[in-house]
């Protein structure tokens, strides 16, 4: 199994190398945070685009992330039990090693994590794409429940790593692309994911001590753009817009944009570049 060894802080050798490279470059870092059922490699094309634009990319994993999709499928147990708080603190430690305050971009639960990091005052500018909801975000559309049902229908899944079947991936991620592209995306990117974050998000509004909370009022949060795919089943517009309404109370620039005709796979499908360039344009305004 190809996994990088972590030091006592939990930061892997590969992550340390990325941080060191970013610091040596003198460029503004852009930290890319993936969500459930994906790996850091899902950001590879984004990283190239941003580096070509003059930034330096850092793609931290969640704790114990395998390096490849093949490894992830062979050893799904490594994902089990990871919580939002554990992942947020891991990203925090990676960001803490950077000499410059980074731009932070996240997708799905990565979009939630990006907002958590921004709420801690650690981001110069943030783009949250199809972000998972946090405490205080109330809408719960039927499609979002269906997308989460492979995990939430069994309480025992909280401590397990859960893969998506192709049909489940097609609904939750790839509903806005062709059948052929959906199958290619599934084979190329989909990996098992921890069940815990979905249970945490589902109960966040009932739990005052939840890890799924964002400091939306911190004036050090910085500028924030929320992007949401028009056809997203997993994070429909109602959820993204409710997140925006909570965030716009912040004194920092807060914007939201709907990406026409796109589903939850908008960061990895054939139209990824449109989304990446939209994010890049926002980052360029502030970093």
Spans of features found by a protein language model:
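Short, surface-exposed "cap/lid" segments of acyl-processing enzymes
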Residues: 23-69
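The conserved beta1-alpha1 loop
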Residues: 31-37, 61, 107-108, 228-229, ...
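Conserved acidic catalytic loop of the alpha/beta-hydrolase fold
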Residues: 85-102
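Gly/Ala-rich beta-loop-alpha elbow adjacent to hydrolase catalytic centers
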Residues: 105-110, 114
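Flexible "cap/lid" loop of the alpha/beta hydrolase fold
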Residues: 123-159, 199-206
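Short beta-strand/loop motif that positions the catalytic acidic residue
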Residues: 220, 226-228, 232
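Catalytic active-site module of serine/aspartate enzymes centered on a nucleophile-bearing elbow/loop
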Residues: 253-287
């Amino acid at each position: 199994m190809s996994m990088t060894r972590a030091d006592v802080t939990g930061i892997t050798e590969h992550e340390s190398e990325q941080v060191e490279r970013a610091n040596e470059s003198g460029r503004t870092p852009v930290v890319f945070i993936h969500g459930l059922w994906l790996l850091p490699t899902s950001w590879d094309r984004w990283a190239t685009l941003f580096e070509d634009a003059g930034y330096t990319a850092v793609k931290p994993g969640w704790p114990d992330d395998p390096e490849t999709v093949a490894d992830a499928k062979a050893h799904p147990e490594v994902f089990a039990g990871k919580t939002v708080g554990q992942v947020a603190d891991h990203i925090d430690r990676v960001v803490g090693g950077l000499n410059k305050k980074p731009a932070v971009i996240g997708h799905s639960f990565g979009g939630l994590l990006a907002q958590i990091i921004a709420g801690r005052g650690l981001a110069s500018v943030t783009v949250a794409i199809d972000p998972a909801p946090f405490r205080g975000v109330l809408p719960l559309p039927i499609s979002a429940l269906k997308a989460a049902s492979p995990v939430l229908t069994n309480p025992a899944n909280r401590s397990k790593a859960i893969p998506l079947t192709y049909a489940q991936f097609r609904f939750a991620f790839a509903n806005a692309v062709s059948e052929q592209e959906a199958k290619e995306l599934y084979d190329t990117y989909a990996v098992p994911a921890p069940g815990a974050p979905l249970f945490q998000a589902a109960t966040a509004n009932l739990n005052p001590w939840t890890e799924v909370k964002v400091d939306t009022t911190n004036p050090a949060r910085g500028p924030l753009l929320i992007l949401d795919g028009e056809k997203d089943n997993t994070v429909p517009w109602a959820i993204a817009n409710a997140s925006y309404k909570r965030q716009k109370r912040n004194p920092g620039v807060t914007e939201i944009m709907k990406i026409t005709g796109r589903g939850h796979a908008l960061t990895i499908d054939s139209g990824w570049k449109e989304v990446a360039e939209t994010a890049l344009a926002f980052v360029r305004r502030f970093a």
